Structure formats: structure tokens, C-alpha cells
Amino acid sequence: MLGVFVVVSAATGFLLTAMQRQAAVLQATALEAQHEALAEIMNDSIKSAVDFQIYQDAPMDASNGALAPGNSSGDWLVCVNQNGTTRFHFDGAQIECQQTGNGAVQTRVFPGASRASPNNGQPNSDEQPDNGQNSHQPIFNLSNLGIIQGQWNVNTAVDQVPFNVFGVPLQMQ
């Protein structure tokens, strides 16, 4: 009788562990899918932009509707197209996407984001490993060729997934 109890207990333990692992994989897959949707929104916003700016701090709204001068890199990206304005903001743990058009404002939050390391997490021989907390690496930057880049990592219970979005705004194509 004791043998049956041990076998049933072990089988139950294995089953619970497998279910926990499956739940972690499903949560990771859902989080990755959310960030894939964010990358698609960001890509569409960049490529259809008739005006854009990158900011290090929260942008001020100009009274004439034009975007205030920005920076070459920062944690804010504002894209204006014919349908409205899309703002992306990284706050250290999530990316917020706010879309404004025809007077309506839609805000979505994408949790689990962290800064991408400039060397894809692979330290040089004289560097300490980057754990995604590099506060000096903004997620948005503008190259000398006019290419906007958004780069971040998504940290799941299973792994860390890098996301990169590149695009040339409509006005520069």
C-alpha cells in the first residue's frame, strides 16, 4: 500500500511540475505576442510618419500643433501621421503606446520590457555583464541616415527576447 502511495505522490508531483512549466511557457508566449503587436504598431507609425521626434524627457505639446525640437536618442518617440499621433514611452519596466486620432485617445501598456544592451548581452572581456538595467542606453535613436530604431528586451519567465524595430519615416523616403 505504501508503494502505491509513493508512486501516486510522485506522479502527482511530476504532473504539477509539468503544469507549472506549461503555464510559464503560455505566459511567456502571450507576453512575446503582445510585444510583437507593439513592434508592428511602432513599425507602421514610423513608416507612415509625416513628422516625428525622439525625446529624452516627456515632450511638451506645442500650441501650434508642431512637435517641439527633440533629441537623437531617448525613451520617448512621437510619430505624427495623417490619422493622428502615436506616442511611445519606455519607463524602465514597460512601454506605453498612446494613439490619438479624431479626438479619441487609446492607451496600451506593454509590460516586461527592459533596455537592450548595446552588445546584445554579450560582455566584452573587460566589461561586466549587462542585466538589462543599463540606464544610459535609450531605447529609441535616430541614425545619421534618418533611420529610427527602437530596441528593447522582453523578460519572460522562460527567456529574454530582443526586439528591434527599424524604419524610415515617410518624409525621408
Model-derived regions, located:
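Aliphatic-rich helix starts adjacent to a transmembrane/signal segment
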Residues: 1-43, 47
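Short, cationic motifs built from Arg/Lys/His that form the positively charged side of catalytic pockets
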Residues: 36, 47, 94-99, 169-170
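Type IV pilin-like appendage domain
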Residues: 57-142
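A general secondary-structure signal for short beta-strands and their flanking turns/coil
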Residues: 74, 145-147, 160-162
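Edge beta-strand at a domain terminus
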Residues: 108-112, 157-173
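A short hydrophobic beta-strand element
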Residues: 143-156
